[in-house]
Structure formats: structure tokens, C-alpha cells
Amino acid sequence: MLEQMGIAAKQASYKLAQLSSREKNRVLEKIADELEAQSESILNANAQDVADACANGLSEAMLDRLALTPARLKGIADDVRQVCNLADPVGQVIDGGVLDSGLRLERRRVPLGVIGVIYEARPNVTVDVASLCLKTGNAVILRGGKETCRTNAATVAVIQDALKSCGLPAGAVQAIDNPDRALVSEMLRMDKYIDMLIPRGGAGLHKLCREQSTIPVITGGIGVCHIYVDESAEIAEALKVIVNAKTQRPSTCNTVETLLVNKNIADSFLPALSKQMAESGVTLHADAAALAQLQAGPAKVVAVKAEEYDDEFLSLDLNVKIVSDLDDAIAHIREHGTQHSDAILTRDMRNAQRFVNEVDSSAVYVNASTRFTDGGQFGLGAEVAVSTQKLHARGPMGLEALTTYKWIGIGDYTIRA
């Protein structure tokens, strides 16, 4: 089955690579229209997936990621339309010039070819990834989690209908609808057909892909994100940022999971934090230095376990640790961070600059929420993933991250001397 999908995707990629920006945008507009026109079939399929997931005891965080509503589906369709408005990087000349030999040389952006994406209970990823791949002239093979099997099948069917109505092969966007995990291992060895693989899931999936894939892998998306409250932070303003970073949508990878508090501000900051977290329904996991003071406040508090500093809660839980100074905070982030998104709240610009320079994450913030690490917020459109590695792409992966380049030399029967 996968062999045939690979062949179909590779053949489709050749046709997609020849499309103009106008033609690709027409396809995307058609997909957005069809997602709205056929929303009932997608929502019905999603309702079945959600019911099964509830019966199987899926966590609240995962259920939130899985569930579609009419508003969410409309938002997904609108995101596709936003991709239409983005500049097409394909065909862009990055640099070039004329050599001494007279050869005119240029480096031009081109599609990667076929993208493989493995993800969990995130039905929006199906459309986000498909739209970005099509905009950049790439075919895509999707493997969603078993929890989204019906939703993905219904969504991809709508996308394929739109493709065919525009004269393009259905092989441009395909989904593996068999939940057998053995197919993941088979997909990881499809280097004959797939040019880049993007896993979007937990640490186990990323480890599996790194160890077994014969395809170049872009890893990331695991967000053990930190906010360091420096001793010069403005408490009231800092709390607004922390509430946003923790509670706006706790199930996302850019949600803060650990709060590092400078010891010199702890006595005034912790009571205010407890009051605010109680109002926000957040459970605090406190270290020994913060535990007694936080237990005296209104928030729900438990003693932090050492392994929780490495956890991506994806829920209304927040670690709180007292640190001696900026060096201590940076050391903690280096040990427990996932190089996703980390922030400092401070009025000391020297400390801010040190934090930016010394915290080696894909996104580092000064006096701002970690929730900004998002393709839409960065002006990149819907993102295919957030990369926490350093080669090829880093941070939210927009259109350029789905391209490579080729060197093109144009001569007049020019030969090398």
C-alpha cells in the first residue's frame, strides 16, 4: 500500500512543481471553499472520533487537540485562505551573478518534492500541512494518529475532491488511514519517495524517527518552555504574561511549563502568583524553597517531583522553582529545556541580553509570552511544525522551510577553461 502511495506522491510532485503561484492559489481557494461546503461530513466524522477517544480514556489535553467545532473548522478554512495571501518562495532567486567565464549563475528556490508528516490527535494539522505543501509545490503523505482516523479520512477526501476539480492528481495529498503502527516503521524507510519527514508528537515518536528513519528528519514540537522572573520584573505585568503563557490554550507546545523565580523577588511575587493561579485554576508544583509560602496562599499546590521538570504537562499545571540568579535560571533551562521557547521578564536589559545570547532555544523572548511561537503569529501563515533542531529549519516552519534550492548555470555554449 505505501509503495503505491509513494509512487503516486512522487508523480504528483512533478506536476505540482510546474504550477504557477496563481494556479496554486486557485487550488487552495477551492480547498477552503470545499472544507466549508462539506463541513458536516468532517464534523460528523470528528464527533465519532471524539466519542471513541472519550470511551478509551484519552486525556483532556488530547481531547482538546482532537475536537473540531464549526468555529474551529471555519478557522482552519480561513487559515488556508491566508496561505493564498503569502508570498510564494518557489522560483525566488536567492543570489547569483556572472562568473569570469561568462556563465550566469543563480541559486533558485525549488520544492523539496514529497513531504512525510507523522502526527497525533491534531486534525487541523492535516489541512495546515497540506496547504503549506501545496503552496510550495510539494506532495505530502500524512499519517495521523489512530484517534483522528475518521476525521483525517473525511478531510483528505474533501482535499482530494478539490484537487481533482482543479485538474490535479489526488496523489498530491494522501493519508495513511490504517492505524497499524508497523506502517510507521515502513514509512520511515521510504527514502525512495519521501524527501523530508516531520514527526509531530511526543518524545517517543521523535526518538523512533531519529533511530529508524532513512529519510532526513526535522524534529521538534516538544515544548518544555520556561519563563524566568528576574528580580527587577514588574510583578503585575509579569503575572499577565504568565497567565497568558499558561492558560490561553494549555494543550499547545508553546505553553509555559516551568516558572523560574529569582530568590530576591520571591517574597513579594509568590503571594501574588498564588492568588492569580487560584483564579486561573492552575495547580502549582513547587520546589522546597517555594512550597511553604505557596501553600499559605489560595492556589492548589503540590510538591514538585524531580522528573516533572522534564514534563510537557499540556494542562493547567505549572512548576515553580526558586533560583539564585540569572546563571542559575540559564543552567536549569539548559538541563531541562527542549530548545523550543523560553522567556525572561525583567527591566534589566543587560540580563535580557545575556538571556537572549545564552539560552539556546529556537525562540527566546524578553517581556513577552512564549505563546507567540506560532507560524501565524510570526507572519509565516499556518506552520507545518516547530523545529527545535538547528539544521535546515528552526522555529515555526513556514513556506521557506518546505523548499530547497538548486544552482542554475546559463551559458552560451560555455566551457570550463
Swiss-Prot record:
Q: In which pathway does it act?
A: Amino-acid biosynthesis; L-proline biosynthesis; L-glutamate 5-semialdehyde from L-glutamate: step 2/2
Q: Which GO terms describe its molecular function?
A: glutamate-5-semialdehyde dehydrogenase activity; NADP binding
Tell me where it mainly resides.
cytoplasm
Pfam annotation, one family:
Aldedh
The yes or no answer to whether the keyword Transcription regulation is present is no
Where in or outside the cell? Cytoplasm
Q: Which UniProt keywords apply?
A: Amino-acid biosynthesis, Cytoplasm, NADP, Oxidoreductase, Proline biosynthesis
The EC number(s) attached to this protein equal 1.2.1.41
Q: Which reactions are catalysed by this chain? A: L-glutamate 5-semialdehyde + phosphate + NADP(+) = L-glutamyl 5-phosphate + NADPH + H(+)
In the record, biological process GO terms are: L-proline biosynthetic process
Main enzyme class? oxidoreductase
Any one of the GO CC terms: cytoplasm
InterPro entries attached to this UniProt entry: Ald_DH/histidinol_DH, Ald_DH_C, Ald_DH_N, Aldehyde_DH_dom, G-glutamylP_reductase_CS, Glu-5-SA_DH, GPR_dom
Annotated NCBIfam families:
PRK00197.1, proA
Q: Which family does it belong to?
A: Belongs to the gamma-glutamyl phosphate reductase family.
What is the protein's known function? Catalyzes the NADPH-dependent reduction of L-glutamate 5-phosphate into L-glutamate 5-semialdehyde and phosphate. The product spontaneously undergoes cyclization to form 1-pyrroline-5-carboxylate.
Query: Any idea what this protein is called?
Result: Gamma-glutamyl phosphate reductase
Query: Which organism's genome codes for this protein?
Result: Escherichia coli O6:K15:H31 (strain 536 / UPEC)
